[in-house]
Design a protein with these regions (language model features):
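N-terminal helical cap/lid subdomain that shapes the substrate entry/recognition surface
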Residues: 2-100, 115-118
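Residue-level marker of regulatory loop/turn positions in helix-turn-helix DNA-binding domains and
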Residues: 87, 109, 142
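Asp-based, Mg2+/Mn2+-dependent phosphohydrolase catalytic module
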Residues: 1-4, 96, 102, 113-224
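Electropositive, surface-exposed helix/loop patches at the edges of structured domains
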Residues: 72-80, 105-106, 220-224
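Conserved SAM-binding loop
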Residues: 14, 106, 166-167
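Ser/Thr-glycine-rich phosphate-binding loops at phosphate-binding pockets of nucleotides
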Residues: 13, 17, 110, 173
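Structural motif
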Residues: 44, 109-111, 167
Length: 224
């Protein structure tokens, strides 16, 4: 095993939140007059902070993206997450196996706002694995695909990024991890749509391994 630290994205890696978040966002953008499909919503916002897509939203809605709207989105999103959120399958067993090996050298580095990340990890009983080691792209000079959140996490752990393994699920996140200087593995759910194309895009972004079950992760890391 060659890795000294593990840096996990949150959405789509630890929690199955993206369908919930995209559902709320899709509904609210329709209310603003942008009649995009769910596929278009995923294309524009997967792995990206909504606030960072301001220009795209304003172009299609012909309305300013206000702080009041962003606040309303977060409130509706958080309510939906509280009601519906589940952990990614097998992640609890994976974390239980990895924690004795890495202990406090595991961090969560998300592009989402801190409140959402903390809410989600607590909801699915994963927060204890990352307590004190949760990093939000909203608190960085730049969010993903810039490497800032991963650089901050590695610095906090006092581990060179070259010795860190990043677990991601989107091209945006993979790009961020690679730019930070870490090795990046990509998780793709076994029921993912258009899987071959999705894997190709992740590899093009720099993912060095793609895997399909969190149950496999501890063994893959041990063998690396």
């Amino acid at each position: 095993m060659r890795f000294q630290a593990l840096l996990f994205d949150c959405d789509g890696v630890l929690v199955d939140s993206e369908p919930i978040t995209h559902g709320v966002l899709h509904e609210m953008l329709h209310e603003q007059g942008w009649r995009l499909s769910m596929e278009e919503c995923v294309h524009h916002f997967m792995g990206r902070a909504v606030k960072d897509q301001r220009a795209v939203i304003e172009h299609h809605t012909q309305q300013p993206l206000t702080e009041a709207w962003l606040t309303a989105f977060r409130e509706r999103r958080n309510q939906a997450l509280e009601a519906q959120l589940q952990a990614v399958p097998h992640i609890h067993a994976a974390m239980a196996a990895l924690q004795p090996v890495f202990a406090e050298r595991m961090a969560c580095a998300s592009g989402a706002d801190r409140f959402k990340v903390e809410l989600q990890l607590k909801k699915v009983a994963l927060h204890a694995y990352f307590a004190g080691r949760i990093f939000s792209g909203h608190e960085m000079p730049r969010s993903k695909p810039a490497p800032d959140v991963y650089l901050a996490a590695a610095e906090h752990l006092a581990v060179p990024t070259a010795d860190c393994l990043v677990i991601e699920d989107t091209p945006t996140g993979v790009t961020a991890g690679v730019a930070a200087g870490a090795e990046v593995w990509a998780y793709v759910a076994p029921d993912a749509q258009d899987m071959a194309r999705h894997i190709e895009v992740l590899r093009q972004a720099g993912a060095q391994r793609v895997f399909h079950s969190m149950a496999d992760l501890p063994g893959l890391i041990q063998a690396a």
